[in-house]
């Protein structure tokens, strides 16, 4: 039995040394140390030995089993290490190789235009004010000189959520809140960009949701000439120094007097073409002097303070600036369209 144990040990250790993969080692473990292996058979035959031989043979069996088990564990560890090293070597990245260029994205054209407009007015000392898109009827209409029975409410079809809550139809509501929240009732100089909503049918020039940017200035001794000068600076910054402006009388409930502002056509330079419908002028925004009722409702003394306001659609400005003929292009997310506006 002792000779057999030594022979089993030699064969097992030889097979372990020759093993090239983990599966082979597992086969050796099962063959020699498993329940049906020769080591187990030797242990079962211990009962046939004399009491004097059992301790010595038991110690020898344990020695052989531990030697095989220890060598198996060492070999498994070595093979696993070799496998890991081979895997790491195959996945090694040569950091000296030239990298692949990362394709950069770009601003959405509307985002770019809004930021350009903000930059122009911030350069003139304006602050950017924002507000909620879900608004109370009061701030969207009543605080802007549009009481519940005012016929001008029909000018804007509105998405109502409840009787007193709606999706704002203009960012003028931000102006109303800013004036009301100005506890000192002092000067204000803000622009208000944001999304607005109207029940329009979507077509080439209309959308049920669009971006609007409005401006408000409140101070003492504000005149119409201040409004005109501000808009002249804006137009020349956005469309070029050669652009001219003209103001036409109009009507808005929250301003008096009210005007529409046109700029000289950038396609024909005022001579008349299809873009400007032969007039040489293109309308871009509405404006006017803040109505005294609006000032009074916000807590201002309309005899001491005056103001002007203006509002424009970002899509309208972007369409003119980039020559886009359909407002829907801004919302279809066609990559071919958007990539044209990638900044250098």
Swiss-Prot record:
Coiled coil: none annotated. Mg(2+) binds at residue 256. Binds 2 magnesium ions per tetramer. PROSITE patterns: AA_TRNA_LIGASE_II. One of its GO terms (cellular component) is cytoplasm. One of its GO terms (biological process) is phenylalanyl-tRNA aminoacylation. It comes from Bacillus cytotoxicus (strain DSM 22905 / CIP 110041 / 391-98 / NVH 391-98). This is Phenylalanine--tRNA ligase alpha subunit. Keywords: Aminoacyl-tRNA synthetase, ATP-binding, Cytoplasm, Ligase, Magnesium, Metal-binding, Nucleotide-binding, Protein biosynthesis. GO terms for molecular function: ATP binding; catalytic activity, acting on a protein; magnesium ion binding; phenylalanine-tRNA ligase activity; transferase activity; tRNA binding. The keyword Magnesium applies. It catalyses: tRNA(Phe) + L-phenylalanine + ATP = L-phenylalanyl-tRNA(Phe) + AMP + diphosphate + H(+).
